[in-house]
């Protein structure tokens, strides 16, 4: 029993130090309430791919890029969150289900890298993009990063934003901050929706 407690303590210590070392995008909180907050982000650089062979395939393509599979063979620090969103025609209502349209997964590059400094991907499935800054309504939740959990919190956020008369201008974005080795009850996830 004592060995188990020591091992668990070590795991939590290790997890806390790893999580603290990962860069996250900076933002300014514009407003907050008990359910969500509105944040303002600057432009960010990301590498992205279309998820045509599942979530794990997309993740591995992006992970290979930051591990050195790029034109300069440069290893790039992992950042958080990893985001997933649906790429839709903006004439379609943004309340459509998450699985309609093509799924896009993004890794944000460290803030020290500018667009012209980002090494180009070797894979044609990847592209370097500028994610425009702006205001996002964000709801935080813990637990597994499942579609069901994401959809539940997306629906809550969309409903509350409608009640608060905040106009959304894009689909819900799933933001995952922790890896699969993090205990599910300690995992941090967010739903982000761009607002006017």
Q: Whereabouts are the PLM-identified features?
A:
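A solvent-exposed interaction/effector surface
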Residues: 2-196
